């Protein structure tokens, strides 16, 4: 799989401007600094929470036919939001009647269970190699219950070809589904579906009401769209807030490398660098060690 540099961030430029109290839409000179701070903050959150991502990704993942199975069950390494296909080690694409996704109540799915009364069993590859013999294609990501979700932006999008890299929304500064303004901002992950093909796009920048995009993001393929409904991804609210706080901290701390702390043992002040704000540390600590947390993806 080819990976591209991601421009999506766990919070948006508009979020940071609000946190910093920048209300003048004309005051944009420092926006590049704020955007860099957002990308740095997103990267730091990913570093602090290895193995987790709070954006959906379309991907085929591979599993060991022995080590990752327990009888009828294939254990998934990360919660699965939407299933596209399951392929056995012998190359057979399993039919929906061959398996059940666990839990039965719906996503997030943590396992694929073969039917007990069926003739199918998990198999190694045809050469006998069990490593990466099984594959599961779908949409994956980590978040908490009912927190990460797609919502409609109130816009439609027309892109004449897979290489068209910009569009002009009807009202870039209008309200979104949560009555927030602007409805589109740098750092957002967008989604559009045409003729059954879904594409993710990332907002690279917005200039003079024109939205510039990175196409075919997060494992999807760029396609042409005509008046397709445009949705945006709402990052887990707690992670989004941590990103806003950390990005604002990086923004304010630019060029400053130490803080003064009083040491009661020496009665002297000590200049010590403060790595992360305490509220951000507290938030990230709550996500550490949480293996495959329960979540559900919604469209609203």
Annotate each predicted stretch with a short phrase.
Residues 2, 104-152, 216-238, 242:
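Surface-exposed interaction regions enriched in Ser/Thr/Asp/Glu
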Residues 31, 63, 77-132, 197-207:
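Extracellular/luminal ectodomains and secreted, surface-exposed scaffolds of diverse proteins
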Residues 2-13, 141-151, 233-300:
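Short loop/turn elements at secondary-structure junctions
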Residues 27-49, 268-275:
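Amphipathic alpha-helical segments that form the core helices of the histone-fold
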Residues 76, 83-84, 143-215, 220:
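Autoprocessing Asn-cyclization modules and mimics
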Residues 48-70, 158:
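Solvent-exposed, flexible loop/coil segments flanking beta-strands in beta-rich domains
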